Amino acid sequence: METEAADESGFTSVASKRGRRKRRAAGAEPMEAAESAEAAGPQPSKRPAFPPLPAAALGVGKGEVRKVPVPANRYTPLKENWMKIFTPIVEHLQLQIRFNLKTRNVEIKTCSETKDLSALTKAADFVKAFILGFQVEDALALIRLDDLFLESFEVTDVKPLKGDHLSRAIGRIAGKGGKTKFTIENVTRTRIVLADSKIHILGSFQNIKMARTAICNLILGSPPSKVYGNIRAVASRAAERF
């Protein structure tokens, strides 16, 4: 059922006659073309060319929803700052937002006017940052800039501390009157929230890395003066590099 033809390099190419016989019988393929194609061997298939999809076909405006749970201690701040949160999400990102009183979730939904695919993710990150304890003005940077991220970890992830030892570690991160935390924020250009034993950092990837290293050193017992010197040296090297 199959024919074998030897080419110049000595390799044997195998071609099937079944499909060609049917096409010959139907008159769709002339005898000469079939014989030449048979002698040449199997032809490589061409890559398909697909046109780019329009935004309407990518699912924009089809009612995608993101839900951000709100803990009880953030109800009052959310109510007081609702218009500051509502305005940029609705006017700039063209999304719909509401607070569901039954499920205690902030629900963000796309609509027919939504043009940007990443708007829903930006809005959800913005609301999440506020719920974690960041100021609205700081959290707004997540909407304006694309290279900002949120990172969260616990003190016990760095060192398994309990009782007074855990309290002292948290106090070392904050410093007297918040001095240590503010110094780390200013040098690394980040924003830090201390919520009990949880630590939330907002900033660019490289700056988050510097702030996280400084906080971990404080938890592990390094004196604050040494930590200040280390992060200032790292920050100056990074500034020279860029």
UniProtKB/Swiss-Prot annotation:
Domain of life: Eukaryota
Annotated keywords: Nucleus, RNA-binding
Record localization: Nucleus, Nucleolus
Cited Gene3D superfamilies: K Homology domain, type 1
UniProt-recorded name of the protein: RNA-binding protein PNO1
Biased composition (Low complexity): 27-40
Domain named KH: residues: 158-215
PANTHER family per record: RIBONUCLEASE Y, RNA-BINDING PROTEIN PNO1
Function field: Positively regulates dimethylation of two adjacent adenosines in the loop of a conserved hairpin near the 3'-end of 18S rRNA.
Xref: InterPro entries: KH-I_PNO1_first, KH_dom, KH_dom_type_1_sf, KH_PNO1_2nd
Gene Ontology cellular component list: nucleolus; nucleoplasm; nucleus; small-subunit processome
Region (Disordered): 1-53
Disulfide bond positions: none
Family, per entry: Belongs to the PNO1 family.
One of the record's GO molecular function terms: RNA binding
Pfam families given in the database record: KH_PNO1_2nd
A Gene Ontology BP annotation from the UniProt entry: ribosomal small subunit biogenesis
